[in-house]
């Protein structure tokens, strides 16, 4: 989903800052709900994602980038924002953080046993990463996710044992 319109000129500005090949095409990516994401087709045949952070301030995005790099440095495969010519990993444009990310050509995670087992292995690897400074103890994606889930469960009578466990963990 796109909340911020991105022109070919906007995309070219970011690509130029990263020293990347010229832009051939740009199209919105489906599936997001809090940011604007676009697939960029480059002249050398490669593809990148241009992400405009609509729900976080540039300062929050900078912190998120630091955490993402920390996780990657500790061996967890995760798309790290590309470094721009000035060493930064984002560009602030019209008060919003803009970045380029590697495009991962893959679908959504399947719900079969092998896929879920693979997910569990990656989650275990993630949990083995030492905690870095500044890591938040709350989780949100443009809103307070857990609190909203609990309110919804109350309103709809949709509590499950897993949600109750999350609720207990969230008040610790």
Regions found by a protein language model. Give the residues of each.
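Short secondary-structure boundary/hinge segments and terminal tails
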Residues: 33, 89-90, 144-145
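Short acidic/polar alpha-helix capping motifs at helix-coil junctions
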Residues: 1-3, 28-35, 51-52
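A cross-family kinase active-site recognition segment
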Residues: 110-170
